[in-house]
């Protein structure tokens, strides 16, 4: 490294490695003027002025036209170049409405740099085009036209002016939409610590050490804590907002992305509080607290510490100042969680500081009036949300050479903006058959470009920003409209809630109806199955200790397997179930299978005790099963009742042809059924229908299509018809015949008690 030395003393007077980053007013003057001696008086020179008498004449001679300097200069030729007008004749006349001017209307900028522009009111259609295409836009437009032309020979190329118009409308509508949408603030500790310095965590300030707020991120710092020599007039920005306002940066020593940042000598970012808290590093520029150095001197053991708050192995941690505590945490995490820490500076420039910090167990209980209890859950929630942004390869190693960034997420354009752009273009009579598809493709390109720019806007026009300020956000009409929309949404929500509840009730009733149908089918077609299941459950309940749960070698299959076979319809008779239970009563077989005498004794006693009781259960089951009215197929006979509650005979065709209730009858069967119905007495008929209608049904027979059905026929359906008025035309009996052969007029009490009950049930079912 080059240095300068005095020839007399040999002392270094200029060291670039130390003075390159120092302000000029702080560098010693001898570094610039090493021979200047301020203690010695200056020498005064006296002499005759005659030796300077010809100086003025020589200067005049130098400036004369005969000077050899002017003769040596080349003669410059000035050529007047006529300005070339902008070629605007090829612009579509419809596109000129968006602010494009012809060559005759071009206004050349005057010599002055001040121009007063009137702020136009907010308008969605009257606006000039403020977007200019760049190289990327031109390349995409060329590729898009070539791609469309390859698939469609009649394709009309999209002009550059059209693309500028569409991108301007999209950008305006997107900015207006963002202005209307409410901002969602993240979980921030600064709301709890409003007005405190983010470095020393103190709110007290003095005239020479005031708290300064950043005009962009609102970060509050002391002058001495952040190296601010004086409070500037006007706006002040922190180092992060001044050097990288649109970038997402991370600290090299912690995962926190908020706070006061400074730079390192190797070009990275870190928090000022992190540089103060870590004892191995220091500031190269102590006056501005910037340029952190000696990062390589941090031991590896500090890089391997895991923070007890964010649970991330990222950067370097500090440890609790208690001599018996080894809790490690980032100092920024400690501030978010409300831990106690205090900075002790031995000078005003923070060139030598000491920090005292304590974990949650050793923090004084009266610190910040119990603020730690509120901030600690917020800090854990903040780092849980951010944990997905930290790659795994950085969790198990020391701080990387570069700051990792997660994938930037940009929001896609809503369909509202796409429709809005199309409507604006149609309002200007921009007529193209493929206009919606072109606008959609341009919106996709706009979304990808915003994503590549990390969601930065494409336009930064002051006129557009002024129009955003004039948005009628607080207009009374809009608030009334918002209330109306909210009321309509609330009504729709209530209707939807009612519909969902009704749907849930309907599905519940359907489920109950399905279960009832299943039970009815089981009772009708498997009458013995319910009897077997109930009998088996009673027998299993007798084995309280579960002695016969497991299968045995004598043929016993166990309660679990036996229950599965019964409930899966593999055992269909009482005799089959008795055979399955015979190994339990076989005492000799049980003795041969069990070696444990205590268990064997209990099983034999259970078999001897319950054998008689089980046989009684089987006898009762057989008696009940024999009392059931079954047909020749083993199905339960369901009585057929008329609308008047009286039982009547079924159609004999089913029994004669040995048909099932689910079989489809032929045309001959239907004819026989028709004759049977016509032969019934008027009091026995359920309904009447024209013969022509029945003949048409027989002629066009594909499935059983008979008029409305009700009642039962051999466990299935009987027929019922209605007249034109919608009233059933069934006939009621005029009189009732008693057992002794006498007749009496029909009344409600004319029937026996059981028949009245049957009839009342039938009427209830019919209604």
Swiss-Prot record:
Q: Which GO terms describe its molecular function?
A: zinc ion binding
Primary localization class, coarse: cytoplasm
Checking Gene3D superfamilies in the record gives:
Zinc/RING finger domain, C3HC4 (zinc finger)
Question: Which residue windows does the record flag with biased composition (Polar residues)?
Answer: 724-752
Region: Disordered; residue ranges are 724-767
Zn finger (C2HC pre-PHD-type) ranges are 248-281
Any idea where this protein resides? Answer: Cytoplasm; Nucleus
Subunit structure comment from the entry: Component of the mst2 complex composed of at least eaf6, mst2, nto1, pdp3, ptf1, ptf2 and tfg3.
Role: Component of the mst2 complex which is a highly specific H3 lysine 14 (H3K14) acetyltransferase that functions together with gcn5 to regulate global levels of H3K14 acetylation (H3K14ac), critical for DNA damage checkpoint activation.
Q: What is the protein name stated in its UniProt record?
A: Mst2 complex subunit nto1
Which species is listed as the source? Answer: Schizosaccharomyces pombe (strain 972 / ATCC 24843) (Fission yeast)
